[in-house]
């Protein structure tokens, strides 16, 4: 039967050498598929079994891959998909990618951000350097402040037309929750459609916190798709 609304689930950073086909985001993909969504859960390039080299520093090549996937959906590559109803669900790095994609593709119906990276690429690179003990994120010094500004999704928020649903744990030790609160503040100041939720949880939700998160995601998707 169908056609079904489409949800593209974008995973966060996992060291590509350790990445497995069924990523930690798979339970969310399964949960949403069981509730009537056609869920696509791509593995970013360089993350097995996807080919190519993983992105270094800026993740815009992942956004290009997602945009190409969306084009395939709209061309009818998935007969059960409703190409007029597509939303994104991005965790951590995947949330950062989703922000870029949603600015380029205003045809999206909604974006769920879960413990998302920033739309400010300078902050992302600073955090990547911190996580990696300086082994990654050297682009922070190689790219000029102006290039980083132009590469940042937050530079273009005034042009955003896609509704956002933003979720972040107050105990997230990997991605600062303040990044999500700043995004929400900026979007509300611009009168953009956004809802924002904080949770007593970390970078990945568990138990009751996760249950409430899933309910809110379903409610948002039910409204926009």
Where are these regions (language model features)?
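Alpha/beta-hydrolase active-site loop
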Residues: 57-77
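Short substrate-entry loop that stabilizes the transition state in hydrolases
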Residues: 2-4, 9-51, 120-121
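Alpha/beta-hydrolase fold nucleophile elbow
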Residues: 79-91
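Short glycine-enriched nucleophile-adjacent loop
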Residues: 71, 95-106
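Conserved alpha/beta-hydrolase "acid-adjacent" motif
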Residues: 173-179
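C-terminal catalytic histidine-bearing segment of alpha/beta-hydrolase fold enzymes
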Residues: 181, 185-225
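Mobile cap/lid helix-loop segments that gate and shape the active-site cleft of serine hydrolases
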Residues: 18-19, 116-156, 162
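Short beta-strand/loop motif that positions the catalytic acidic residue
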Residues: 160, 166-168, 172
